[in-house]
Amino acid sequence: MLFTVSCSKMSSIVDRDDSSIFDGLVEEDDKDKAKRVSRNKSEKKRRDQFNVLIKELGSMLPGNARKMDKSTVLQKSIDFLRKHKEITAQSDASEIRQDWKPTFLSNEEFTQLMLEALDGFFLAIMTDGSIIYVSESVTSLLEHLPSDLVDQSIFNFIPEGEHSEVYKILSTHLLESDSLTPEYLKSKNQLEFCCHMLRGTIDPKEPSTYEYVKFIGNFKSLNSVSSSAHNGFEGTIQRTHRPSYEDRVCFVATVRLATPQFIKEMCTVEEPNEEFASRHSLEWKFLFLDHRAPPIIGYLPFEVLGTSGYDYYHVDDLENLAKCHEHLMQYGKGKSCYYRFLTKGQQWIWLQTHYYITYHQWNSRPEFIVCTHTVVSYAEVRAERRRELSIEESLPEIAADKSQDSGSDNRINTVSLKEALERFDHSPTPSASSRSSRKSSHTAVSDPSSTPTKIPTDTSTPPRQHLPAHEKMVQRRSSFSSQSINSQSVGSSLTQPVMSQATNLPIPQGMSQFQFSAQLGAMQHLKDQLEQRTRMIEANIHRQQEELRKIQEQLQMVHGQGLQMFLQQPNPGLNFGSVQLSSGNSSNIQQLAPINMQGQVVPTNQIQSGMNTGHIGTTQHMIQQQTLQSTSTQSQQNVLSGHSQQTSLPSQTQSTLTAPLYNTMVISQPAAGSMVQIPSSMPQNSTQSAAVTTFTQDRQIRFSQGQQLVTKLVTAPVACGAVMVPSTMLMGQVVTAYPTFATQQQQSQTLSVTQQRQQQSSQEQQLTSVQQPSQAQLTQPPQQFLQTSRLLHGNPSTQLILSAAFPLQQSTFPQSHHQQHQSQQQQQLSRHRTDSLPDPSKVQPQ
């Protein structure tokens, strides 16, 4: 019994120990798990922090367009730090360690502050005047960009009257020492002189203004300058700029303004595209200014609140800004022009503003104007202004000048300073430089060395006036256009001597190499102008020849269509009376034999161009028609006397013309109906000449200022023997085509029997006198306008043809005129029956 109790106690103790051991193990596992979790959390936190730092470091490295791994980021960071350490060591070596320089300022900052305080800028030039370096502070003082001055000659920015003096100063100071030793360069080479320098302008057409400045500096040898401190000079300086014995020597100077400027433009922009915001009332008063404004403009918000924005604008920009604000009030938003804003440091800074009007959300009334101001550089402003003025930027021109000048410098040998000084003694205006820039084309002043202030350009007093390049081109073109050049040989004969002179011209003894190169360039420009003028003259000659050829073709076409007369009539015979070919000169009058036509074609009369004032005058036309009657009675036909028509031909043509111009056309064969209009003049009296038709080379036909009548010639398929007459003579009656000739209609009446007989007898006498071979010169007074009673009689078929041939002309007259014509026609028909009876005294016996 006792043994049993002890065994049970032992078993309970063993169970208790096992449970305690298990519990201890579980507790240890929990502790390890907690430690592991905390360790993992800390490790993850460390990795995340490391990744953030690597990412931030990679964002600061250049060339981070693609994603870089950690090793690349670390490698680039190491390279950057190594280079930065080297640069820092070099800057520490050249750091100014003087008591007068604050230790908290770097060299660049101290230099900029000193230049602003002195109203000056740094300038490094070679001994021949070539500029190799200029500081950025030149923009705020002379309104030049550094790129405008670098690689240019200093003499391009100095008046011509001071060229010789400045050149002597730069050259003679070097010649004081035989050898450029380091001791001389350190001790005795300080140089000071004063002169005028050209101010820059946005618009090159503005008058040039010069600023009186003072140069203070010394000569430096580029050999003693370390390669890291060259600042790119080595690539800028060309070998042709350095004479042999003065190699790698330049004059470094501080250029100061004699008259200080109290308000200057800010020369540089630290960070481009800097901007700040502001709010303005509708009266343009400041209501709000954000935190980005004070570092830019210098004002704190409380200093500008309540003030007008116009208090800070430049006076020259107020007009343009007012227009921009008017546009804003009309459209609600917009962008301003470039304008200057006065900073707290009394400097002008260029800004451009984007603005819009905000409205109240309940009543939609305008509340205020929100503005975003952006800082712009002077280079952007000048480029934009010149684009608005359609002026090319000077940078391409400078590049072109550099390429041209480098070639000219290679061709011209550099002369020594001693020879240059000898030329100074013999020549009043020595050489300046072989370079020529666009700036020098605006400089024109007399000797201004005695004027210590700003001097505007005087364009009237100096003998040598410089003009812009486009004005020179205009003057040269006007001078060339004023000279009359009539052929191609003139232009070619002018260009060839100029070219030979430009290639073979020797250099005069008293002229420098640079002046000769300038003259050579001028002669080359003159040659180009002459060649251009020659091409223009050749084009004009070809155009005139083409016009002359077309005029000749038109004249031949007119004569081929309407001026050849065909007559095919089986029985009747037509005799054309005297045809007179007259001219303005009585010695040139030629007589033509009468033309007898029996159904033949009229031969053409050749008219030579030697008749400069020749006129073709058809003085008389006698048409006699023999009727086929059994009684063999011959009756005379009324005379159709056409008015004189004169045609003036150009004396330059050597072509020939066909038969004389007639107002009537005789058609021999059937043809398609056509209409030809020939203007004819209505003479006022018997002493006036007929209409003059002048054919000129401008393809126009001009007529005299007298009264004109358009005679319509209608050709239609008619039978042989029909005689076509002008439509102004309608069925035997004179018709006035224009109301202005109503006064002459009263004079147009039918001829009586006695007048017809007298006219017939006089015309027969003239006909017989023309046929004599030794007849003297004929003089015929101008004929009056066509006055006749009848054209044809005794032939009803012919009258029907005439009435059918002119239906258009009859329909054009008013009804009242038509009735009047019919009444007059009936009276004349009855009168003609009595007039057509043959005269017994003139009837030939059978």
UniProtKB/Swiss-Prot annotation:
It comes from the Eukaryota. Its EC number is 2.3.1.48. Residues 478-493, 624-637, 644-654, 811-829 have a biased composition (Low complexity). Keywords: Activator, Biological rhythms, Cytoplasm, DNA damage, DNA-binding, Isopeptide bond, Nucleus, Phosphoprotein, Repeat, Transcription, Transcription regulation, Transferase, Ubl conjugation. There is a cross-link at residue 67 (Glycyl lysine isopeptide (Lys-Gly) (interchain with G-Cter in SUMO)). Residues 450-570 are annotated as: Interaction with SIRT1. Pfam families: HLH (PF00010), PAS (PF00989), PAS_11 (PF14598). InterPro entries: bHLH_dom, CLOCK-like, HLH_DNA-bd_sf, Nuc_translocat, PAC, PAS, PAS-like_dom_sf, PAS_fold. The modification Phosphothreonine is found at residues 451, 461. The record marks 39, 43, 47 as: Interaction with E-box DNA. A motif (Nuclear localization signal) lies at residues 32-47. Residues 447-463 have a biased composition (Polar residues). GO terms for molecular function: chromatin DNA binding; DNA binding; DNA-binding transcription factor activity; DNA-binding transcription factor activity, RNA polymerase II-specific; E-box binding; histone acetyltransferase activity; protein dimerization activity; RNA polymerase II cis-regulatory region sequence-specific DNA binding. Residues 336-379 form the PAC domain. It catalyses: L-lysyl-[protein] + acetyl-CoA = N(6)-acetyl-L-lysyl-[protein] + CoA + H(+). Residues 420-495, 624-654, 764-783, 811-846 are annotated as: Disordered. Ubiquitinated, leading to its proteasomal degradation. GO terms for cellular component: chromatoid body; CLOCK-BMAL transcription complex; cytosol; nucleus; transcription regulator complex. The keyword Disulfide bond does not apply. Residues 371-845 are annotated as: Interaction with NR3C1. GO terms for biological process: circadian regulation of gene expression; DNA damage response; negative regulation of DNA-templated transcription; negative regulation of nuclear receptor-mediated glucocorticoid signaling pathway; positive regulation of DNA-templated transcription; positive regulation of NF-kappaB transcription factor activity; proteasome-mediated ubiquitin-dependent protein catabolic process; protein acetylation. It is found in: Cytoplasm; Nucleus; Cytoplasm, Cytosol. Component of the circadian clock oscillator which includes the CRY proteins, CLOCK or NPAS2, BMAL1 or BMAL2, CSNK1D and/or CSNK1E, TIMELESS and the PER proteins. Forms a heterodimer with BMAL1. The CLOCK-BMAL1 heterodimer is required for E-box-dependent transactivation, for CLOCK nuclear translocation and degradation, and for phosphorylation of both CLOCK and BMAL1. Interacts with NR3C1 in a ligand-dependent fashion. Interacts with ESR1 and estrogen stimulates this interaction. Interacts with the complex p35/CDK5. Interacts with RELA/p65. Interacts with KAT2B, CREBBP and EP300. Transcriptional activator which forms a core component of the circadian clock. The circadian clock, an internal time-keeping system, regulates various physiological processes through the generation of approximately 24 hour circadian rhythms in gene expression, which are translated into rhythms in metabolism and behavior. It is derived from the Latin roots 'circa' (about) and 'diem' (day) and acts as an important regulator of a wide array of physiological functions including metabolism, sleep, body temperature, blood pressure, endocrine, immune, cardiovascular, and renal function. This is Circadian locomoter output cycles protein kaput. It comes from Pongo abelii.
